[in-house]
Amino acid sequence: MDGLTLKRTPDAIKWIQDSLAESNIDYVLKHGTYTTQIQHSMGTIKLMLNNFQNRVFCASQMVKKDCKNSVNGQEIMKATHYKKNYDANPKIESIKYDTCLNIDLSSAYAYCLFNSGLITKKTFNYLLKLPKMERLTSVGMLATSHVKYFYSGGKCVDFQPYREPTAQIFFYLIDEINYLMQDIKWMLGNDFIFYWVDGVFMKPTTPKSKIEKVENLLISLGYKYKYEKVENFSVNRIQDKVIIDMIKNDESKRYEFSTGASGRELGKHIAKKAMQDLQN
């Protein structure tokens, strides 16, 4: 079974484990976000969730190298960052609109990396050339994790978890984009409906002056954006749970999330604003 590369499924992993146990062969099972490797005395078997192009791994290595070599990257890796990336207007209980305004950031994480001085222009341009999902995957590999399970006599005798040292940089990206979305939320006031990751949704009656403020903010921070077509938009709230349905770019979408206590998020936003004022 040396040198095999298979599609990662529970059945495939079980078959290999059973075969090794029956043959009384000790092995190490390394299970990660995208791949599972089974290393034994006769070689290694690799099981892949997706068959990524080499350019994805190349981009990932370029990003990691740049981040590790940057002064800002070293500081970010020492800190802890929040991972929340959504929010909704607490005053909205239930609404329906034939159409809705939606601004999406273009290549948000790539621009955040570059704007934060974490990657070089060369790496930034390489990322922008990748298709969207490949770009997201290559940046997401900053937070790659795996667990090694050590098997002897067909039973697990030990395990070792591992997380990439650059993981906090990925969480920093989430945090920074979330902070930007919070800024936009405050700008829009009652016209804000909700945001999800790097896309913000607002009422179709939002004044042009508010929209221009949002656009000017994004431009000033070095982000590109686009407007997406949104129809049949509805929001329903059940206590802390928000359910949002829409047709976006002719595709049906649903978002569900909880809007529980967000005091920590609000406090962080206020503190960051205050620090910016003090520094200026």
Predicted regions and their residues:
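Conserved acidic
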Residues: 1-280
